[in-house]
Amino acid sequence: MNGTRNWCTLVDVHPEDQAAGSVDILRLTLQGELTGDELEHIAQKAGRKTYAMVSSHSAGHSLASELVESHDGHEEIIKVYLKGRSGDKMIHEKNINQLKSEVQYIQEARNCLQKLREDISSKLDRNLGDSLHRQEIQVVLEKPNGFSQSPTALYSSPPEVDTCINEDVESLRKTVQDLLAKLQEAKRQHQSDCVAFEVTLSRYQREAEQSNVALQREEDRVEQKEAEVGELQRRLLGMETEHQALLAKVREGEVALEELRSNNADCQAEREKAATLEKEVAGLREKIHHLDDMLKSQQRKVRQMIEQLQNSKAVIQSKDATIQELKEKIAYLEAENLEMHDRMEHLIEKQISHGNFSTQARAKTENPGSIRISKPPSPKPMPVIRVVET
């Protein structure tokens, strides 16, 4: 805006007979210098109040803007349409967009009101010192054409214009109070959403840490089981070797016994030796039977240990899947948190930049960035160990 020569007006341009479910339109009007005839024509149309409006549909709509010109060619209009959002967006993204739209509208209304107050104060201070040439101040607040700033219209003011000014000031004051209340409510809602997000993120992190500890314990148990299985297999191989050696001794004893029986059946010494060999053979058979029982028992234990090992590996795989899901959730929430912070920073910068008025207002729409989180490949299945009895 150039000093006191230009005004910015935020008005509602939808017709009076508009349906309840139709699209709301907000118009920003930039008005420059006008001639006396044009100002008189504008003053005749100043029958309705100018007000700033925040659409109640902004909670579930996105913004679309359009730059057009009015019929008389003296003002530039930016129409902001509120359209429906897609249903697959997250709830907190909708809340952020709603806050962004409401804060933008509130900031525009606040800036317009502040500019109006400054201009009125400056004109009052300047015109009160010059009592000979300037007796009254006329401020016309007109719905389609904004504020009148022509010096020729400031010298005379009828009583009807003063009444309209008072009503417009009261209306703007109430509107600003409502907008400030909505801004405070939106800030409180945003703070509560941030606290809930932090609590959820902390809970997910605790669950991930607990899952990591449980996974480490299961891995230690699996390593211990594998060591025990290796020791049992080593003992089993030793017992099998000993079993083969005992069988060879039994065969040798039987061959020697048969030779002794065939050579000299009447020799006492041979008989005693044969009896001794028979006793040894009986003892060896008992040992072989005992070793067979022990071997079968060890095989059963090995099978049980292998089953336990497979069950433990299955549990570890399920824990890995759970941890991976939790990591994906944490990554997704962190990405959303970063996006939320970026949008809030952008909103704050945009609010600060609105303090300096430009000659033309332009609307920009932003598409939220998408973050794709690739899912890591699933772990390979563990090998199956089988023990075959011989």
Swiss-Prot record:
GO terms for cellular component: cytoplasm; extracellular region; I band; RNA polymerase II, core complex. Involved in the structural organization of the epidermis. Involved in the mineralization and structural organization of enamel. GO terms for biological process: bone mineralization; odontogenesis. Residues 358-390 are annotated as: Disordered. This is Tuftelin. Belongs to the tuftelin family. Its main location: secreted. It is linked to Woolly hair-skin fragility syndrome: An autosomal recessive genodermatosis characterized by woolly hair texture with slow hair growth, and skin fragility present at birth or appearing in the neonatal period. Skin fragility then resolves or only persists as minor skin peeling, predominantly affecting the palms and soles. InterPro entries: Tuftelin_GRINL1A/MYZAP/CCD68. It is found in: Secreted. The lineage of its organism: Eukaryota, Metazoa, Chordata, Craniata, Vertebrata. Expressed in the epidermis (at protein level). Present in the extracellular enamel and is mainly associated with the crystal component. It comes from the Eukaryota. Keywords: Biomineralization, Coiled coil, Palmoplantar keratoderma, Secreted. Residues 88-126, 162-351 form a coiled coil. Interacts with TFIP11. One of its GO terms (molecular function) is structural constituent of skin epidermis.
